[in-house]
Amino acid sequence: MEARSRIKVAAAVIVQGNKYLVTQRGYGAYKGFWEFPGGKIEAGESAEDAVVREIREELCVAIEVEKRLGTVEYEYPEFHLSMECFVCRIVSGEITLREHDGAQWLHADELNSVSFLNADVEVVKLIQGAGR
């Protein structure tokens, strides 16, 4: 049996007031699904540095990491995803979508109203469990 590829990513749970930023994927096999924005951790890069870089590249804003929320491990059919999640705030810039088809700010009780990627469903559980 062939070893499954393991992808390590960092995700930003961006908070503004009592709302969370969610983005709609604009590419790939999971196009159209919603997620917490972020991306792959590059070799030699910390997860915190990766999430700051990815958000700057994808959304054109600078963020500050407030705290680590947790790690989600999820088995997709094609790969194993290890996603480190951080609670963040935007410190400068205006959101410009460079890779996503949509973005919206949702209250915690509205997070179940969009079709999240499976791993991101687990992030919603972390948010709700943290009482954030």
Give the label of every model feature segment.
Residues 36-68, 107:
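The catalytic Nudix box helix
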Residues 22-24:
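Beta-strand scaffold of nucleotide-dependent catalytic cores
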Residues 4, 12-13, 26, 73, ...:
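Short secondary-structure boundary/capping segments
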Residues 29, 34, 96-132:
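Nudix hydrolase/Nudix homology domain
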Residues 62, 72-94, 104, 108, ...:
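Active-site-adjacent beta-strand/loop module that shapes the phosphate/pyrophosphate-binding cleft
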Residues 1-20, 40:
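Conserved N-terminal beta-strand and adjoining loop/helix that marks the start
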